[in-house]
From Swiss-Prot:
Gene3D superfamilies (alphabetical): VC0467-like
Domain of life, per lineage: Bacteria
PANTHER family tied to this protein: UNCHARACTERIZED PROTEIN YQGE (PTHR30327), UPF0301 PROTEIN YQGE (PTHR30327:SF1)
GO cellular component, one term: cytosol
Source organism: Xylella fastidiosa (strain Temecula1 / ATCC 700964)
The protein's name in its UniProt record: UPF0301 protein PD_1276
Cited NCBIfam families: PRK00228.1-1 (NF001266)
Assigned protein family: Belongs to the UPF0301 (AlgH) family.
Any Pfam family the entry gives: DUF179
């Protein structure tokens, strides 16, 4: 008899102050895919050096929306840093998209960016360059080693909270003040 598999899809990982990996220090990552082969997610609180306007220009997509052009593109993680990922909240699905949770999708399709540029795309979307990846069992080990806290994803945290507030606010959803935690452990 096999054990039921727990999926971490649609969970936010919140890096604890003791996180040893600088890619994820004070990071918040949305887990988009998780199975026996590993996990994939997108870091939600690291700005890249690019705006969405610059990315759209490189793709040959024009937009009249100043707000869209000024939107910060996230540094989604160290894996595939030249590849774009779009997390969006919508009833409509653009191109091939992966359902993360209730109306929340991930896509690498250019279609959603073109629709956003035309004003017909999802009203709430995050664009990231790169993603985070974990080998089979790696993320589970990191959880056991107390590198991460976990909370269910929340659309308001993803789309309505400023980047610099996401780390503390995500932990606050489960009553944790990250600034009161130490970054070392001891043995009794």
């Amino acid at each position: 008899m096999s054990m039921p598999t727990m999926t971490l899809v649609n969970q936010l990982l919140i890096a604890l102050p003791s996180m040893p990996d600088p890619h994820f220090a004070r990071g918040v990552a949305l887990i988009c895919q998780h199975d026996s082969n590993g996990a994939m997610g997108v870091v939600l609180n690291r700005p890249s050096e690019y705006t969405l306007g610059e990315v759209l220009f490189q793709m040959g997509i024009e937009t009249a929306s100043e707000t869209l052009r000024e939107q910060v593109v996230l540094a989604g993680g160290p894996v595939h840093p030249d590849r774009g990922f779009v997390i969006y909240d919508s009833e409509h699905v653009w191109g091939p998209s992966l359902l993360i949770g209730d109306g929340l999708y991930l896509t690498t399709s250019r279609d959603v960016l073109a629709a956003m540029a035309e004003g017909s795309g999802p009203s709430r979307a995050l664009v990231a360059l790169g993603c985070a990846g974990w080998a089979a069992g790696q993320l589970e080990l990191e959880l056991v080693e107390n590198n991460w806290l976990m909370v269910p994803a929340d659309a308001s945290l993803l789309f309505d909270t400023a980047l610099e507030q996401r780390w503390q606010r995500a932990a606050g959803r489960i009553g944790v003040d990250l600034f009161r935690l130490t970054d070392y452990t001891g043995h009794a």
